[in-house]
């Protein structure tokens, strides 16, 4: 008898392939089922908000995966998905709450006044008194809009809609359907958080990595200056590009952080990070919250500092070992994305407190690539425009 470890992936691939209406190998099936499940079904298990909408949305994505094929009418399907996604975001505009953009606006005001934005409690945060725990890239991203006195939520809304337009223009119906219908993505597009913009910056960084490891190092260095979470893809990048990729990341990071380090020093920045880490005294959207829902009482926070960082270290080790075992063959693009995603999820969610909004940081790259990784074909005549951007990759 063959071991179940051999038969199970093939059986799952056949089942997913039946739903999709085409034959899939286990890797393709994992991407086709895994991305919608992560963004649609996992949040739907959390009580409250409108996350339950992820269940019918998952069915809609399955229908898109089965029905939308290359042909003369597919442009209409893409336009309908695009319109539905924009309408969903308009319906949920302002739903939910986050004080991140309020803090960012106040931090920019302090920076313009010649003061440090770090290690300060901002009264306009939710709840009042939270610090600014982000980097210079975040300040630079929002600065032009803050100077024009825009409501920064509209920046997030525009970025979210721009992603939908780009996915439609590339002819990627599955990624477009996931991005359009995911309740979490529609909510964080205007709830006052900065995760949508962080996801766009990370998308650009990872697409640069697809074009070359040194470019990827520069991109991740810049993205890490927005939120440190982007550095989850560093181990895979270094295993691909070696010391040149690492040097590019370090130099880009130094260029981003040098003005802040020279003007205010590392102390206030590190203090803001420690301050932000200790703000939340309740377990939610995390491993601790999952366990607490079963035990019925409050769980202590200290074990989850261990699970978070020890688990992250184990995943980093697994990524490095996997990449080393593949040598001299290069790490595949799918394996590179999956390794960084695993580090990202473990470090952020095997913790005491986390946020549903963090999923918006990885959603753009997943929606951008899921059609290709699942073996789907672009579906309309704008394909030549997409091909011009399909450059040779070091991730073979």
Predicted feature descriptions by range:
Residues 220, 232, 256-257, 383:
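Preference for long, amphipathic alpha-helical scaffolds in soluble/luminal domains
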Residues 2-206, 210, 214, 241-363, ...:
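Primarily membrane-embedded glycan-assembly and transfer machineries that use lipid-linked glycans
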């Amino acid at each position: 008898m063959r071991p179940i470890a051999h038969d199970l992936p093939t059986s799952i691939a056949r089942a997913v392939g039946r739903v999709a209406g085409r034959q899939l190998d286990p890797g393709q099936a994992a991407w086709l089922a895994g991305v919608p499940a992560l963004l649609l079904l996992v949040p739907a298990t959390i009580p409250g908000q409108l996350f339950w909408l992820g269940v019918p949305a998952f069915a809609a994505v399955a229908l898109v995966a089965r029905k939308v094929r290359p042909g003369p009418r597919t442009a209409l399907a893409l336009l309908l998905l695009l319109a539905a996604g924009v309408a969903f975001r308009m319906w949920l505009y302002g739903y939910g709450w986050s004080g991140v953009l309020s803090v960012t606006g106040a931090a920019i005001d302090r920076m313009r006044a010649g003061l440090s934005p770090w290690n300060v409690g901002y009264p306009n945060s939710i709840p009042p008194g939270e610090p600014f725990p982000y980097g210079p890239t975040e300040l630079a991203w929002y600065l032009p809009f803050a100077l024009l006195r825009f409501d920064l939520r509209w920046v997030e809304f525009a970025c979210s809609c721009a992603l939908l337009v780009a996915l439609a223009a590339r002819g990627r119906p599955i990624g477009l359907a996931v991005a359009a219908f995911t309740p979490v993505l529609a909510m964080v597009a205007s709830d006052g958080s900065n995760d949508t913009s962080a996801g766009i910056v990370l998308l650009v960084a990872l697409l640069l990595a697809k074009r070359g490891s040194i470019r990827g190092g520069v991109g991740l260095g810049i993205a890490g200056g927005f939120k440190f979470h982007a550095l989850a893809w560093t181990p895979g990048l270094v295993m691909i590009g070696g010391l040149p990729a690492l040097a590019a990341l370090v130099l880009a990071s130094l260029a981003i952080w040098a003005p802040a380090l020279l003007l205010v020093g590392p102390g206030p920045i590190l203090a803001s990070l420690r301050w932000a880490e200790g703000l939340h005294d309740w377990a939610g959207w995390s491993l601790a919250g999952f366990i607490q829902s079963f035990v019925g009482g409050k769980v202590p926070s200290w074990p989850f500092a261990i699970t978070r960082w020890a688990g992250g270290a184990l995943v980093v080790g697994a990524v490095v070992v996997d990449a080393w075992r593949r040598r001299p063959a290069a790490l595949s693009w799918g394996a590179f994305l999956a390794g960084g995603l695993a580090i990202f999820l473990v470090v952020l969610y095997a913790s005491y407190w986390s946020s549903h909004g963090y999923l918006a940081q990885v959603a753009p790259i997943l929606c951008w690539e899921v059609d290709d990784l699942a073996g789907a074909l672009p579906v309309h005549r704008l394909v030549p425009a997409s091909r011009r951007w399909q450059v040779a990759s070091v991730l073979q």
